[in-house]
């Protein structure tokens, strides 16, 4: 048992490999809260949120009470103002839910991780002792996203443009891991991070963010 329990965020731009990194952490039996999943659950199930989204983006935002992902994505990422609007609706609710889930997980775990692409955009960094940034070159990230069929090149570029650049994130993150290599190399970095965090928790060293 660690002297200090730790809340740790894992972030990174689209296609950086943060989800794969978190999968390796989860394989070690550490809880990983996925902010993107929470956001989708809130959008689909929170009546007040749905009403705000429909008011801003129209009735087509939902079909048969289900999220119209294609319509909303086109609406949101076609205009930076719409990104700000949807974030202002979702981020406060996501932050509350993440806080709740972290507290629940810390009852039985020394370290809880949260995977979230928009840690800095949502101003969530002060919720955590440490923020971990996973980075990769823009061309590498683009190839990954297109290869797995998630987005077209144009869709990738639109979403990438609406995220804070890695250069700025690197200045604010506590740990930065490059992910331009193999999956095995990324796994080794995840293992290394866990070892470091256990050491920090054992010595009760907190980040300057929460001291």
Go through each PLM region and give its residues:
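Walker A (P-loop) phosphate-binding motif
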Residues: 1-37
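Small-molecule kinase domains that catalyze NTP-dependent phosphoryl transfer to phosphate-bearing small molecules
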Residues: 97-98, 105, 126-127, 147-196
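ATP-dependent small-molecule kinase phosphotransfer cores
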Residues: 37-110
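ATP-dependent NMP and nucleoside kinases share a basic, alpha-helical "lid"
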Residues: 99-107, 111-147
